């Protein structure tokens, strides 16, 4: 594995410009003062109740996500490259989804194999030929980005279904501004506070045609036992919209209504945080108690907008991910601004052979996996784990892809022994409305807190940082 790119210190220890003021501040701040504020941050997070659930964790169902008080900083120039690449990527994703559920030009052209679509469990034939308002399928995208050198930002994953984490981005900034006003006074940090307003505007803009009054938006949650329930409640409050469960909604005459103390009120847009399988027991899983019976009939009639659209899971499938550079080129006629990680498709015999011969050097992922589960990090795995994975690959090669072990960039992070570099990634949030694509400057920086670890997922012991984009 290559040496990780240090985001604060350049070659021969030269300080990178974006971090110059932070470096001076750190030198002026006694370690005990920094530690005190770190403890204050933890107390504030506990008081606010920012937690996430870990399924199958018998010891602690609710955990506090560790927060590191040293911000991750990017210059305006660096952000400009990222922003252009993200806009391009999400535009291509929306065109791809429109195409595979309609004309399927990309399949006829042989750019993406048909079997990868039609045999994919997250492809939704119910969406075939169905139009969605303004042709927007991915209203909210959380694109995972890693940095490997000064000029290269690489897409690790396209989260196009129900991306989470934006509440932590907003709360991280609020806590930092509260605890470190002196540090903000020394930087011109681009704000992220407008995200809820931008999200609400995007959602209202994609309401079905014919809605004359201000569209009514609701956030559909699976309920209090969902791992991201805190975020659902937080966002509904910030947006000023109703937080509803399936039982709060009813479909009448192919229109969706929510029950209120004043009677039924029509809903025009649902920001849904419920997976496709559970949305409508009449269409998908009949045992679902999380969804709304008849919701898909209202959707097919064009009387409700679902954000994100049903069927977007095909766009963040890890096997499809490997074709994204070709997808961008096919629809936009442009080279991708943001590169992909080199990916071996284990469904292809030649790639599988290479992966089996090099398991100890590779990262192997389930094509439908998430949260850092079900993956092999070869360099950190035991021989027994590698051999067990080898058997899995031989039995079900189409269920996996493999990638080189990337040297994720590092940022200074508080540890028990003082400041030390830790690996990070970045999840910016991209909002697509009827006319505009909006990206608040920043995102959720996730950090692998264990020394040497490359796994940043909170479910696997990772933490978060505030992300600063410097206005210049």
Identify the function of each model-found stretch.
Residues 1-472:
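Preference for protein termini
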């Amino acid at each position: 594995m290559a040496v990780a790119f240090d985001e604060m210190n350049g070659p021969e220890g030269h300080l990178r410009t974006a971090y110059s003021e932070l470096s001076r501040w750190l030198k002026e701040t006694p370690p005990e003062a920094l530690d005190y504020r770190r403890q204050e941050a933890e107390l504030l997070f506990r008081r606010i109740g920012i937690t996430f659930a870990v399924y199958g964790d018998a010891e602690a169902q609710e955990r506090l996500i560790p927060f590191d008080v040293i911000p991750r900083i990017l210059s305006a120039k660096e952000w400009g490259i990222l922003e252009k690449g993200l806009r391009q990527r999400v535009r291509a994703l929306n065109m791809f989804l429109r195409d595979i559920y309609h004309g399927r030009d990309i399949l006829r052209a042989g750019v993406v194999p048909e079997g990868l679509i039609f045999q994919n469990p997250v492809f939704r034939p119910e969406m075939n030929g169905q139009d969605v308002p303004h042709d927007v399928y991915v209203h909210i995208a959380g694109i995972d980005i890693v940095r490997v050198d000064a000029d290269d930002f690489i897409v690790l994953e396209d989260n196009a279904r129900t991306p989470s984490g934006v509440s932590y981005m907003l709360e991280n900034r609020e806590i930092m501004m509260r605890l470190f006003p002196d540090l903000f006074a020394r930087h011109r940090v681009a704000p992220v506070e407008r995200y809820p307003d931008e999200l609400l505007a995007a959602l209202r803009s994609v309401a079905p045609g014919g809605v004359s009054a201000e569209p009514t938006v609701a956030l559909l949650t699976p309920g209090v036992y969902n791992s991201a329930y805190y975020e659902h409640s937080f966002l509904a409050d910030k947006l000023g919209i109703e937080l509803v469960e399936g039982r709060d909604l009813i479909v009448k005459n192919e229109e969706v209504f929510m029950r209120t103390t004043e009677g039924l009120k029509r809903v025009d847009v649902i920001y849904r945080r419920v997976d496709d399988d559970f949305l409508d027991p009449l269409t998908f899983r009949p045992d679902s108690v999380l969804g709304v019976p008849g919701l898909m009939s209202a959707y097919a009639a064009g009387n409700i907008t679902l954000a994100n659209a049903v069927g977007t899971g095909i766009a963040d499938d890890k096997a499809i991910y490997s074709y994204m550079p070709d997808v961008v080129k096919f629809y936009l006629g442009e080279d991708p601004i943001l590169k992909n990680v080199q990916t071996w498709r284990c469904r292809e015999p030649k790639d599988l052979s290479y992966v089996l011969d090099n398991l100890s050097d590779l990262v192997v992922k389930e094509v439908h996996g998430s949260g850092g589960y079900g993956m092999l990090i070869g360099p950190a795995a035991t021989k027994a784990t590698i051999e067990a994975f080898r058997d899995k690959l031989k039995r079900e090669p189409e269920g996996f892809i493999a990638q080189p072990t990337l040297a994720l960039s590092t940022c200074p992070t508080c540890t028990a022994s003082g400041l030390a570099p830790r690996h990070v990634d970045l999840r910016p949030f991209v909002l697509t409305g009827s006319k505009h694509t909006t990206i608040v400057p920043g995102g959720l920086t996730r950090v692998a807190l264990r020394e040497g670890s490359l796994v940043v997922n909170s479910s696997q012991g990772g933490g978060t940082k505030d992300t600063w984009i410097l206005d210049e």
